[in-house]
Amino acid sequence: GFFEKAAFYGGTALRIFHGLQRFSEDLDFSLLEVKPGFSLEPYLKGIEKEFSALGVTVSIEEKYKTAATNVDSAFLKPDTAWKELIIKEILPHESVKMRPGLKIKIEIDKTPPLGFTTEERLLLKPFSFYVKCFTLPDLFAGKMHALLFRKWKGRVKGRDWFDMEWYIRKKIPLNLEHLLIRSLDSGDWKEKSMTKEQFMSLFQNKIQLKLFN
C-alpha cells in the first residue's frame, strides 16, 4: 500500500493526530527513500473510489509549480509530486462535512531529506486505519527548518511561530540531526554538522529579525 512507501507529515498531520488547533490546506507526504520516478497514478482510482463510497465525487488534477510562482511552497522542489483534489459533488450525508469546490493540495516529496523516523498512528474517522507518520521530534525539525529558512516574501509565516510554540509547550525534543539534513538539502547550511549552540544562534537571529521587521 501507499504507506509502505510514504509517510504523512506537516501541519495537517500535526492537527489530525496530535490536536494542533490550526487548519492546514495541504496534505504533505514524504517517500521513505529517494525515488525520483515515483508516481501517484496507481493510487488515484483508489482515492476516487473511497470518496465515492461516501457520496462524494472528486477530480484529481496535476499541478505544476514554477520558480516564478514559488511563493507559498518555498521548499517545493521540482521533483515534488503535486496533485490537487477537487470536491465536485456531494450527496447529503450526516458524516460528510465538505462543500463542493473545496480544493485539497497533495504534495509528495520524491527525493526527501532522510534521517527521520516514523510511527503508526490510528485514525478513527471516517474509518479506522493506521497511517505512517513522522514522529514528533522529526515534525519539530521540519517546522524549525521552515521557520529558520522559509523564504515567503521576506517574512516568516505566522503559522510557523504558532506551531513552534505548540512544540515548546508540549516539551517535544528537536531532532537536530534531521534539521541538519533538511538544511543541507535546501542549501541553507553548508557545514557538515550543527551544534545546539549554532542552532540557538540561528534561532535568536530569526527572533531579532522578527522583532525589528
Q: Where on the chain are the PLM-derived regions?
A:
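Anion-coordinating catalytic cores for phosphoryl-, nucleotidyl-, and glycosidic chemistry
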Residues: 24
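Structured mid-to-C-terminal alpha-helical surface segments
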Residues: 1-6, 17-20, 32-213
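Glycine-rich beta-strand-to-loop/alpha-helix junction loops that act as flexible
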Residues: 9-12
